[in-house]
Design a protein with these regions (language model features):
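Post-Walker A helix-loop "phosphate-sensing" segment adjacent to the P-loop in P-loop NTPases
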Residues: 22-29
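Small-molecule kinase domains that catalyze NTP-dependent phosphoryl transfer to phosphate-bearing small molecules
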Residues: 6-9, 103, 127-131, 139-211
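ATP-dependent small-molecule kinase phosphotransfer cores
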Residues: 33-113
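Short, well-ordered beta-strand core segments
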Residues: 28, 115, 136, 191-192
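Walker A/P-loop
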Residues: 14
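Short, well-ordered beta-to-alpha junction loops that form the rim of enzyme active sites
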Residues: 119-122
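Extreme N-terminal starter segment of soluble prokaryotic enzymes
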Residues: 1-3
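Hydrophobic anchor at the beta1->P-loop junction of P-loop NTPases
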Residues: 5, 117
């Protein structure tokens, strides 16, 4: 089985993946795995910290790297900013829209284990999992961001959507990166409510994988 998970930061994606790998033998891969490998090599950053699976690593990813910021004259240069820019603007937009999808597809065609992917951020990534025979889930926890409705409207596309252009303006004004809003409002196979206890979350996952 292949399971693709999407959700905002702190929604519980990593918690679900840890449960599946620990108790059900799933192997964890990610669309951004090779991107993080590259950034760790080029910028000399700790690879585990780039993963952002702990509170301390997520906080570190938001901190400006003083040496690189001064050297490249980019005041806002944080590890997370680099991942977004390199992953989307440089590689997706500048090289090929399917570069990260193809990288994961290459891993999937060789895989023999059950797979969990925790960083589905774009429609083509969600579709790739479905096309591979996998299932997708959206994890919800806490309040939705103020720009949520704008993201839903924008992701519907321009056809018959009078709010499309205005929605993009609102997202740009809110300084929301495409990797944060592009998964909002898409159709998923399952929706997970993670506003309860950890046991309640695990029970939802058990029911899902035993369908």
């Amino acid at each position: 089985m292949i399971i693709g998970i999407t959700g905002f930061i702190g929604s519980g994606k990593d918690t679900i993946a840890d449960y599946l790998t620990t108790f059900h033998g799933y192997k964890r891969i990610s669309f951004a795995g090779t991107l993080k490998d590259a950034c760790a090599a080029v910028f000399g950053w700790d690879r585990e910290m780039l993963e952002g699976t702990t509170k301390s690593s997520r906080e570190w990813r938001e901190q400006v790297d003083p040496w690189w910021s001064e050297r490249l004259n980019i005041p806002e240069l944080t590890p997370r900013w680099v991942l977004q820019q390199w992953g989307t603007e440089v590689c997706r937009n500048g090289f090929h829209n399917d570069i990260w999808v193809a990288s994961v597809e290459n891993q999937l065609r060789k895989a023999k284990d059950n797979i969990v992917i925790t960083d589905c951020r774009f429609a083509n990534e969600v579709n790739a999992i479905k096309n591979a025979g996998g299932i997708t889930m959206r994890v919800e926890r806490g309040d939705r961001p103020k720009w949520y409705d704008s993201a839903v409207a924008y992701n519907r596309g321009p056809n018959g959507n009078s709010n499309w252009a205005l929605s993009k303006i609102k997202l740009d004004k809110a300084k929301v990166h495409a990797s944060e809003y592009s998964s909002v409002g898409l159709k998923y196979d399952h929706y997970i409510d993670n506003n309860g206890t950890i046991d309640e979350l695990h029970n939802q996952i058990e029911k899902l994988i035993n369908l």
